[in-house]
């Protein structure tokens, strides 16, 4: 492989640290996604990077070691007492040729883009830095910016890191003053502020020699305070270049993460919790799905007069209800193509929750996406202690066959006024959603 820049002859080795134990999702490295262990998806992504000459998995667990070796890939057994993934990688790096370039790829990133790896390696090969790492846009207030598990990074005009933190940074001072000194309110009302934030992605590129030097340094004050080992490098004067990821990756830390990644790999659909910035697309899907799916069923003038802005305002107001949730389904460049929202029932009966809306654009119906979204919503309800579920549907709705397929039974009837006409509706119920 030809490498350009300061070190044209150095080989590039991707090392993937993989532990079996995990506090939130034990054994995740071997959990199957589309019939293949998670760790092997990460291996294949790393192997697809054009700048990478060799891929190794570094593990202390024989089960992971055997799974990787049996797949025809390289694995190395390491000591069990390493305090971090960097130390595990350093043990492997000791046996690599001097001048090697090391890529630290997190084992629980089965969607890491090969292009992201290439971008980071190419930045390292240009020289002048000690470490290259990766960032991507931050888009969610509560799920990301205020989440201490999501590490934020700020960098200078030259692209070099200034600081990493679990706290939100930088601080939107002027915007906060416009909203009574409340930065959260500022971010809720001025979503364009999010372009100033970056989320750190835990991929690193460094020379073999710098890695060995780094792991021999004692822990530093800020590193221990924030529990972020990259601060040890900054506190010791390292130059860390930050490059943008090519596409978003998803680290698998929870069962919900695993389900999301599985849907993407198996079906190409990304089902996730809705964010504030999704609501305009959601309102558009709501109106368009009605206009296209219910043509000939409800009056044309009612469909023509449906307002996306009114739907958008309604969804924005509902977001403040602590018992309200929304999930969206996104499909590649098409963006959001379906959604569901649910919460405290408005229908009569003894049900714990109600689905208020469940819509997909017609071209994405009968694709299996609806069933995946429905099951994900149900699992989230079960996690929150919900046992039973209801929804209402127009008698003539084309969606009724889907509700029947998902095990719903008709438990009542009602009517809705659409325009100047009354339309018969049916109420579906599920008594035990844990069985869905």
Language model regions located:
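N-terminal glycine-rich phosphate-binding loop and ensuing alpha1 helix
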Residues: 8-58
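Conserved acetyl-CoA-binding loop-helix of GNAT-fold acetyltransferases
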Residues: 36-40, 360, 366-379, 404-405
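Short phosphate-binding loop-to-helix
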Residues: 56, 62-122
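Conserved core of the sugar-phosphate nucleotidyltransferase
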Residues: 114-220
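Acetyl-CoA-dependent GNAT
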Residues: 273-279, 287-297, 301-363, 374-376, ...
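Conserved active-site alpha-helix within GNAT-family acetyltransferase domains
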Residues: 371, 396-412
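Conserved GNAT acetyl-CoA-binding A-motif
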Residues: 381-393
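Conserved catalytic-core motifs of GNAT/GCN5-like acyltransferases
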Residues: 390-394, 409-426
């Amino acid at each position: 492989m030809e490498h350009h820049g300061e070190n044209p002859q150095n080989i590039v080795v991707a090392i993937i640290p993989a532990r079996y134990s995990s506090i939130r999702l034990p054994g995740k490295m071997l959990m199957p996604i589309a019939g293949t262990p998670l760790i092997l998806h990460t291996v294949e992504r790393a192997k697809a990077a054009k700048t990478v000459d060799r891929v190794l998995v570094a593990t202390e667990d024989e089960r992971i070691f055997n799974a990787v070796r049996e797949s025809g890939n390289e694995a190395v057994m390491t000591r069990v007492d390493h305090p971090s993934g960097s130390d595990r990688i350093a043990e492997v790096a000791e046996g690599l040729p001097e001048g090697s370039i090391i890529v630290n790829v997190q084992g629980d990133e089965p969607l890491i883009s090969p292009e992201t790896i290439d971008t980071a390696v190419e930045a390292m090969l240009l020289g002048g830095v000690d470490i290259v790492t990766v960032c991507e846009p931050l888009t969610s207030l509560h799920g990301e910016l205020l989440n201490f598990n999501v590490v934020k990074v700020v960098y200078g005009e030259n692209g070099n890191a200034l600081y990493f933190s679990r706290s939100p940074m930088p601080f939107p001072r002027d915007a906060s003053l416009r909203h009574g000194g409340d930065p959260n309110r500022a971010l809720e009302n001025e979503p364009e502020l999010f372009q100033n934030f970056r989320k750190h992605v835990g991929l690193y590129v460094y020379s073999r020699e710098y890695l060995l030097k780094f792991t021999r340094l004692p822990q530093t004050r800020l590193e221990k305070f924030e529990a972020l080992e990259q601060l040890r490098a900054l506190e010791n004067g390292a130059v860390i270049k930050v490059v943008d990821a090519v596409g978003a990756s998803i680290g698998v830390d929870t069962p919900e993460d695993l389900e999301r990644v599985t849907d993407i790999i198996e079906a190409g659909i990304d089902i996730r919790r809705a964010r504030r910035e999704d609501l305009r697309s959601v309102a558009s899907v709501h109106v368009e799905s009605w206009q296209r799916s219910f043509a000939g069923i409800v009056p044309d003038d009612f469909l023509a007069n449906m307002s996306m802005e009114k739907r958008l305002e309604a969804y924005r107001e509902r977001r403040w209800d602590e018992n309200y949730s929304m999930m969206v389904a996104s499909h590649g460049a098409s963006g959001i193509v379906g959604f569901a929202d649910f919460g405290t029932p408005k229908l009569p009966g003894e049900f714990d929750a109600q689905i208020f809306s469940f819509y997909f654009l017609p071209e994405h119906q009968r694709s299996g996406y609806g069933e995946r979204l429905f099951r994900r919503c149900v699992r989230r309800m079960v996690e929150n202690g919900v046992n039973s579920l209801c929804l209402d549907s127009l008698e003539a709705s084309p969606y009724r066959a889907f509700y029947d397929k998902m095990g719903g039974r008709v438990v009542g009837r009602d009517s809705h006024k659409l325009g100047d006409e009354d339309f018969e509706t049916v109420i579906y119920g599920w008594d035990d959603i844990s069985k869905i």
